[in-house]
From Swiss-Prot:
Species per Swiss-Prot/TrEMBL record: Leptospira borgpetersenii serovar Hardjo-bovis (strain JB197)
Reactions this protein catalyses: [[Fe-S] cluster scaffold protein carrying a second [4Fe-4S](2+) cluster] + N(6)-octanoyl-L-lysyl-[protein] + 2 oxidized [2Fe-2S]-[ferredoxin] + 2 S-adenosyl-L-methionine + 4 H(+) = [[Fe-S] cluster scaffold protein] + N(6)-[(R)-dihydrolipoyl]-L-lysyl-[protein] + 4 Fe(3+) + 2 hydrogen sulfide + 2 5'-deoxyadenosine + 2 L-methionine + 2 reduced [2Fe-2S]-[ferredoxin]
HAMAP family in the cross-refs: Lipoyl_synth (MF_00206)
Ligand binding ([4Fe-4S] cluster 2): C80, C84, C87
Matches recorded under Gene3D superfamilies: Aldolase class I
Identification of the protein by name: Lipoyl synthase
Cofactor: [4Fe-4S] cluster
Cofactor note: Binds 2 [4Fe-4S] clusters per subunit. One cluster is coordinated with 3 cysteines and an exchangeable S-adenosyl-L-methionine.
Primary site of residence: cytoplasm
Gene encoding the protein: lipA
Amino acid sequence: MINPLKKKPRTHFLQKAPEKPDWLKVKLTFPDPKNNPVAIVRNSLEKKKLNTVCESASCPNLNHCWSRKTATYMLGGDICTRRCSYCDVASGKPSALDRDEPKRVAESAIALGLKHVVITAVNRDDLEDGGAAHFAETVEVVREGLPDCKIELLVPDFKVRPESLEIIFQCKPDIFNHNVETIKRLFPEVAPQKKYERSLDVLKIASEKGFLTKSGLILGMGETVEEVKECMRDLIGVGVSLLTLGQYLQPTPTHLPVKSYVLPEVFQELRIYGKSIGFKGVFSGPLVRSSYHADEQVSWNP
């Protein structure tokens, strides 16, 4: 069920996105209905009343990922306390945390037989710890049921509160992921409640603690290639090992307008550049998202 808050205009803009080029047009395939992994994942999530960033953020890769029996669980409800101009997750006043949610995430992951679980959350600035303890509890119960499963946490910045970050560190995720999302100049327009330096600080602290760190950017929001490269150097400077680069796709006419559709050759150029400056893995392409083929990104190193 679509949250009615998603229908509220996200910005003052009212501009339909330009037609997508061929390389961004996703071809949907419909497997055998008797053995349909997409339906299996959807039924598992609906049965457990779980949210995913796949649906809440209108990800273009939903069918592809679900056909591989992978999904990114989204904790804390489906209402975010922040209002980024590009994001399709509903914004507003969230409900109280569902204390049974961690258990249901674990049950779903076990039922799907996942070997790599990605767990994220909406921003919960209304909570003292930003939802960190809820992350930790979820990791604990998933590990109990799937001891050999790799766990990747895609976390908010927690406003760089040391106590919140320490809760995350104590649960020892296999991958610590925090997306910077865009270049420094665009933060006031794209993510006005976030700060570029704050995101870098979070990643630096995690790297210094010895965690495998990962971040990502969305391109096509008005940045230049040189600004992207500058951001990549900033990320290397704070110890980030894995990077994802993908194309911004405008969810509705009231969201931040797409400024450009970045050519596949530019994504390739940025991948090569990222490898040259020290990233262990750079997953770069128009339809790449932070958790797209996340299980492969850890070892993906062409």
